[in-house]
Curated annotation (Swiss-Prot):
Keywords: Hydrolase, Lipid A biosynthesis, Lipid biosynthesis, Lipid metabolism, Metal-binding, Zinc. The lineage of its organism: Bacteria, Pseudomonadati, Chlamydiota, Chlamydiia, Chlamydiales. Its cofactor is Zn(2+). It comes from the Bacteria. This is UDP-3-O-acyl-N-acetylglucosamine deacetylase. It comes from Chlamydia pneumoniae (Chlamydophila pneumoniae).
Amino acid sequence: MLERTQRTLKREVRYSGVGIHLGKSSTLHLQPAQTNTGIVFQRQSASGNYENVPALLDHVYTTGRSTTLSRGSAVIATVEHLMAALRSNNIDNLIIQCSGEEIPIGDGSSNVFVELIDQAGICEQEDKVSIARLTRPVYYQHQDIFLAAFPSDELKISYTLHYPQSSTIGTQYKSLVINEESFRQEIAPCRTFALYNELCFLMEKGLIGGGCLDNAVVFKDDGIISRGQLRFADEPVRHKILDLIGDLSLVGRPFVAHVLAVGSGHSSNIAFGKKILEALEL
């Protein structure tokens, strides 16, 4: 059986910023936690008490354009970029107090959360955690979206992105073994993106109240609108891998598998994560 020591942060760290969808400011307070706590978000209720929202599939509330968790009256939106950084750095136990309903977007990538982990430092804890391994393939398909996971001794993600409506994105493919180093260098810097012709719809729906060129890349047929150039020629597919890592972290336990994805988004990622969890619990 694969196993490693559990991890938390060495000290508390804070970060304030604006949420990309709601457009409201929020402050994160990341606090070390004891072994076997898991990742737990906290929102302060009207009475002043903190409501716990474990970062688990059971608490996924919505998956439109981002992944939102909820428990009781507490809601935490857009958790995927933070969760991807925690998962890829093997952070198992953490209390995350959030003053608002949405995680700050930073620059649209996971860089700010990797930097927070570095500021706090990583604490190796006494207890071990088992790393689950699939014993059979797992599949999910909905229309032209496809996901599969195969037994492996490492976490590897192979993603195919197909955007026929955008000649500047087109078809992109990336396959990568996910570990702390590869995530930091190859995935964490990759920003969220949108198509130019989607922006009016998103604005009308109030879905990008905090979106700007400081935290997203906009793709047009004849180029991009961005602060600077793309960080990678295939930045969109890499960001899709980032989102997938964050969503699958809600399985709630570390696991290894070779994950294949074609055109998946938050809704399909979460549905697929539930199938993986079922397979691991057999």
